[in-house]
């Protein structure tokens, strides 16, 4: 197996409990290349090639138990009459993987299709229209997938109470007429923009119950969200609206070892004051032709090891005792 020391991969004498594939922000669209609002090039048609290479690599490794897609499966600039076609085109590539893929949606997904439709298309393992869930690939570990747009101005019908409440929240937090603009907001307050969202009260209660159960079972928990939840791991403007509330629940327990996210395309890694690792994954969308950003994570009893390809950085995440 692989290990990382100062960014150098070398053989490890231990076998992992299991491994899983990771990819974030494919944001496919059948449109010419463009740039982000920060001027970073975006390769809309090439991003699906990154996914194809990821799936091919995972299948060749034979030991990848499942994969996780961290959201934004297609881009907001995708022509709306092609949204369904584009989502299906990307999902067809995920279907070529030899194991299951667990999905979450991001803001770009919600620019294209309503929440209920996405829950169905992405085959989220829930018994309702909710987009948060948990699963346990082995007795020692549990994965918790959050819906970072549960409380959001995106994805809900315009006349839905959540939409009205979220817009009221943004009016209070962001004085700009363009609620996607963080101009004038300072520090972590820059997160109060429309392209972000938060975890609602019911989901927070569910999260508490899941972590309580995981603690009783002595499971390590890996928390997954489209939106990052630590200021050290991402741009302030990319953070979840109520990351502080989520982390307050996390800190009541000692079972959460790492939080993974997408959304902030440059990626990042931090360890918070309670020893929890936060790893924001580099985006597939911003890979020039011939380059890639995906990886797999080897899971051990006492650490996680992200083995990245190309633009996705290798990261060793050792747990505190």
From Swiss-Prot:
Keywords noted in UniProt: Hydrolase, Metal-binding, Zinc
GO molecular function annotations of the record: 2',3'-cyclic-nucleotide 2'-phosphodiesterase activity; ADP-ribose diphosphatase activity; CDP-glycerol diphosphatase activity; manganese ion binding
Pfam families associated with the record: Metallophos
Domain of life: Eukaryota
Residue sites binding Zn(2+) 2 per the record: 72, 107, 226, 263
Chaperone as UniProt keyword: no
Membrane-spanning residues: none
UniProt-listed SUPFAM superfamilies: Metallo-dependent phosphatases
Reactions it catalyzes: CDP-choline + H2O = phosphocholine + CMP + 2 H(+); ADP-D-ribose + H2O = D-ribose 5-phosphate + AMP + 2 H(+); CDP-glycerol + H2O = sn-glycerol 3-phosphate + CMP + 2 H(+)
Signal peptide start and end residues: none
Annotated residues for binding of Zn(2+) 1: 25, 27, 72, 265
EC numbers: 3.6.1.13, 3.6.1.16, 3.6.1.53
Cofactor(s) of this protein: Mg(2+)
Zinc keyword on record: yes
Record-linked CDD domains: MPP_Nbla03831
Subunit structure of this chain's protein: Monomer.
Family per record: Belongs to the ADPRibase-Mn family.
Function (record text): Hydrolyzes ADP-ribose, IDP-ribose, CDP-glycerol, CDP-choline and CDP-ethanolamine, but not other non-reducing ADP-sugars or CDP-glucose.
Protein name in UniProt: Manganese-dependent ADP-ribose/CDP-alcohol diphosphatase
Species the sequence originates in: Oryza sativa subsp. japonica (Rice)
